[in-house]
Each structure stands twice: as C-alpha cells, then as structure tokens.
C-alpha cells in the first residue's frame, strides 16, 4: 500500500490499542496488541508518518534507528549482584535499564503523556550480536528483562532485501506475532504532500513530466544509483534557499 494508506492503518491500530472500557481496561488486551512492522524502501516517509500520528493522537513518540546502537545500549550494562538461593549466596548477573526503555520513561516525564509510540527503525538491519535482542523485542515486547511500559504501542520499520545487503529475514515465529504492512512509493500521494508543504515548483513540475524518475534504485558500473522521495524534498529545500539568496543578493555595481 502507499504511505498515506499505511498512515491511516497505523493510526487506527494505535487508537484501538489505546482505547479502554468504562473502568479503564484496554479493549484489546496487551497480549493481543501486535507490534506493527512496516516494510518499505528507504526515504519513503516512514519516520515522518510516525511523527504525524503521534501529533494527531496527542501521544508521545520515542524514535530510534537501531543500527546506531549496540547490544549494551539496547539491553543495558551487566553488573554482578549477590543473591541468596537455597541458603547459599550466589553471584548473579543483572542489567542496568535499557537506554531505549529509559528514553520512554524520560519522554513520559518530559511530555506528561503516559501513552505513546516506540518506533524502532531499520530493525531488520542490525548486527549479528543484536539480532536476538530484536527478535525478543518483537515477540515479548521487552529489552532484556525490562518490558515496554503499558500504554506504549510498538512500531518497527525495515527495508526489503533488495534495498539493503545487511537485511536479516524474520522467521515465521516472529512474523506470526507482528502485523506487517508493506509500503510502496506512489507519486500521486507524494504530490499531495508536496502541494500541502509547498515544495519548490521546479521539483513538482519536473516529476509531472518525468514520473518514472520519482523513485528509482539501480546498479551500474559506478555502483548503486538512486533517488528517493526524501531526496526530492531535500532538493526542494535547496532550491528554495537558492531562490532566497538570489533575491536578497546585492546587485553588482
């Protein structure tokens, strides 16, 4: 589906997950609230729609690109603690709070909002050491031994294998515990976005004439050549800045 339809689907899911009955119980029990898994090419707008959904639902948002993190920052740092088991003192390994879980609590304190979205990007592109942690996160909604707080909806995003060589395929057990939404770029949807955000007319006019250039990734002798929706928006910002500088530059003497 296109990015606009995906946004609507996710927004409805978030609203359903956070809805409660007259005595405050979730209409959908937490165990039935499947994490949402977005799969789509880079630069299509996955992170942007999460920001929009959080704003429209008046909830908090914590977003992480997981490839920027290590196992220690995701799970926490280990430390040794003495425990008594069966009358014997034993040294056991425990962990500090996950940096990601700590960020959720910090967002709740900062915004005053108890509900939110925890968005993990590039979840299927993690290193080998972090991959089991991500599987546990999707299956159990935990990082290490710490659960994601109640009232927080988990949304993850990844890239299909054709766009990223480091992609790791999820097994059937994991896929059976998530709600997967596949996203494809669609020019007409992006054009609506471009008009609403007043992107540079040179960009929109060019894509009217060359729609086949909107989203393209190919390999040639020089390596991977690509253009994405994000790239067109960045170009628009550059052109608008150039226009502003041109109009405000002093005239030559």
Where are these regions (language model features)?
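A generic secondary-structure signal
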Residues: 12-16, 238, 248
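Active-site catalytic microenvironments for nucleophilic, acid-base chemistry
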Residues: 56, 140, 238-241, 251
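AAA+ P-loop NTPase catalytic core and its hallmark functional loops
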Residues: 2-207
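Conserved AAA+ ATPase small/helical "lid" subdomain
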Residues: 198-246
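Conserved small/polar residues in nucleotide/adenosyl-binding loops
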Residues: 247-253
């Amino acid at each position: 589906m296109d990015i606009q339809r995906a946004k609507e689907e996710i927004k409805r899911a978030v609203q359903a997950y956070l809805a409660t009955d007259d005595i405050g119980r979730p209409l959908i029990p937490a165990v039935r609230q499947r994490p949402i898994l977005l799969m789509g090419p880079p630069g299509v707008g996955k992170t942007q729609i999460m920001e929009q959904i959080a704003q429209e639902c008046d909830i908090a948002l914590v977003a992480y690109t997981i490839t920027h993190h290590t196992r220690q920052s995701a799970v926490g740092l280990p430390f040794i603690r003495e425990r008594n088991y069966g009358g014997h003192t034993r040294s056991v390994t425990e962990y500090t709070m996950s940096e990601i879980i700590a960020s959720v609590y910090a967002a709740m304190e900062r915004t005053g909002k108890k509900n939110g979205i925890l968005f993990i990007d590039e979840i299927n592109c993690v290193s080998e050491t972090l991959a089991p942690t991500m599987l546990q996160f999707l299956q159990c909604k935990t990082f290490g031994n710490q659960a994601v707080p109640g009232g927080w909806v988990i949304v993850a995003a990844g890239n299909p294998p054709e766009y990223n060589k480091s992609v790791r395929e999820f097994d059937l057990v994991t896929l059976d515990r998530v709600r997967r939404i596949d996203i494809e770029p669609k020019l007409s949807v992006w054009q609506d976005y471009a008009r609403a955000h007043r992107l540079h007319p040179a960009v929109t006019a060019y894509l009217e004439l060359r729609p086949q250039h909107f989203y393209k990734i190919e390999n040639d002798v020089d390596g991977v050549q690509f253009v994405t929706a994000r790239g067109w928006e960045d170009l628009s910002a550059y052109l608008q800045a150039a226009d502003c500088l041109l109009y405000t530059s002093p005239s030559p003497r």
